Curated annotation (Swiss-Prot):
It comes from Lacticaseibacillus paracasei (strain ATCC 334 / BCRC 17002 / CCUG 31169 / CIP 107868 / KCTC 3260 / NRRL B-441) (Lactobacillus paracasei). This is Nucleotide-binding protein LSEI_0959. Gene3D superfamilies: P-loop containing nucleotide triphosphate hydrolases (3.40.50.300). Displays ATPase and GTPase activities. One of its GO terms (molecular function) is GTP binding. It comes from the Bacteria. The keyword Nucleotide-binding applies. Keywords: ATP-binding, GTP-binding, Nucleotide-binding. GTP binds at D62, L63, R64, S65.
């Protein structure tokens, strides 16, 4: 007897976090496909069924046009009558204001506002997606969620009973002058390292620039501290995992979050990326850089 296919359709507002969601499903062992045209799905099901090896699929479905939307609705109707496929819909949402903010930050164009106002495109998309949202088994509002928090919500809703998703580490740089990260599990202060801020050529740059990174890391104090911190994390990460945590946030801070913490976070994050799923984020890098450039 052919094993049924567990299908999750990831959809929702553009900019609400579908890319992060797809990565989370990959960590849960799903075969993920981004933006496959609905017209190709029957052939895709046929190939999956014939392979006999794929039992969990997550499809990211974006709204490109009214015609595309009609194809999606037809696809869902066909799935309702398909005994082989057990489907669920995950709808990701966020407030209009938050979506505008995210689009302005990334400078990308909204798919339904290529030649018009961003807000008009958002409102048009929201109206078109009303039926899909109403049909969704899971709706997640990502307005106030970090990528880590969204991942955890997906793990909570979609991991199989008794299964454990891949352990996830978020390494975050930050500036103490902008406050401690409230969701950090581990906070480390690297303000004792040499500060590139006082070197004129390095001041407008960041710890992502090779010359600044090397300035911060290429000294005995930095190397010694890195080795000890790495050893500590190597010892405690398996213990966090054994306790059932799905993720740990390591926050590394310097004064402004532009130079030292960025360089150190990059090195720590990359060091653990072979053993764990790792995200490296720099909370205050743009904020402090703008302040420096104005001074």
């Amino acid at each position: 007897m052919t094993e049924s296919l567990d299908l999750v359709i990831i959809t929702g507002m553009s900019g609400a976090g579908k890319t992060v969601a797809m990565q989370a499903f990959e960590d849960l062992g799903y075969f993920c496909v981004d933006n496959m045209p609905p017209a190709l799905l029957p052939k895709f099901w046929e190939l999956v069924k014939e392979s006999g090896k794929i039992t969990k699929v997550a499809l990211v479905v974006d709204l490109r046009s009214r015609a595309f939307y009609d194809q999606i609705i037809d696809m869902l109707a066909n799935l309702d009558n398909n005994a082989y496929v057990h489907s669920r819909i995950l709808f990701l949402d966020a407030t209009d204001e938050e979506l505008v903010s995210r689009y302005k930050e990334t400078r990308r164009s909204h798919p339904l506002a290529m030649e018009g106002r961003l807000m008009d495109g958002i409102k048009k998309e929201r109206a078109l997606l009303t039926e899909l949202r109403n049909r969704a088994q899971v709706v997640i509002d990502t307005t106030t969620l970090s990528p880590r928090q969204l991942r955890e919500k997906i793990f909570l809703n979609f991991k199989e009973s008794g299964s454990q998703p891949a352990f996830h580490i978020e390494v975050m740089s930050f500036g103490f002058k902008y406050g401690l990260p409230i969701d950090a599990d581990i906070v480390m202060d690297v303000r004792f390292l040499p500060n590139p801020f006082y070197i004129k050529d390095y001041r407008p740059k960041t710890g992502l620039d090779p010359e600044v990174y090397n300035y911060v890391m290429d000294n005995e104090d930095a190397e010694s501290f890195y080795n000890k911190f790495y050893d500590l994390l190597s010892e405690i990460m398996p213990k966090y995992k054994a306790e059932g945590k799905t993720s740990v946030t390591i926050a590394i801070g310097c004064t402004g979050g532009q130079h030292r913490s960025v360089a150190f976070a990059e090195r720590i994050g990359k060091a653990f990326s072979d053993a764990y799923a790792v995200d490296i984020t720099h909370r205050d890098i743009k904020k402090h850089k703008e302040t420096v450039n104005r001074s």
